[in-house]
Swiss-Prot record:
Designated gene of the protein: rpsI
NCBIfam families, A to Z: PRK00132.1
Record organism: Streptococcus uberis (strain ATCC BAA-854 / 0140J)
Keywords: Ribonucleoprotein, Ribosomal protein
Family named by the database record: Belongs to the universal ribosomal protein uS9 family.
InterPro entries: Ribosomal_Su5_D2-typ_SF (IPR020568), Ribosomal_uS9 (IPR000754), Ribosomal_uS9_bac/plastid (IPR023035), Ribosomal_uS9_CS (IPR020574), Ribsml_uS5_D2-typ_fold_subgr (IPR014721)
Name of the featured protein: Small ribosomal subunit protein uS9
GO cellular component assignments: cytosolic small ribosomal subunit
Amino acid sequence: MAQAQYAGTGRRKNAVARVRLVPGTGKITVNSKDVEEYIPHADLRLVINQPFAVTSTEGSYDVFVNVNGGGYGGQSGAIRHGIARALLQVDPDFRDSLKRAGLLTRDARMVERKKPGLKKARKASQFSKR
């Protein structure tokens, strides 16, 4: 019999993560690398594990992730969003706790575009009255 697989797609800033959950030991693989090797910051690895902590399913699923776009922070947020969506497929009863923790909401904050005549999105040259 085929092993159960659960999929979820997560997005954050410019990063898109396609996540697969397979019942296992809790190993996380990101773009064919171990999560410790791919994401060097320990606090961002904690962000990735938040959905498992909220649903108390740490160590129950192996996670396989394909992620592209963005930097470490955006990719970690996208992986977290994808894992939360995949856990919903595992057990729909997780929805309440995941929603309360804010893990199912797509963070809509994006980089503001640079405006013409300004140095950055909002930074202008110093104003001179005379």
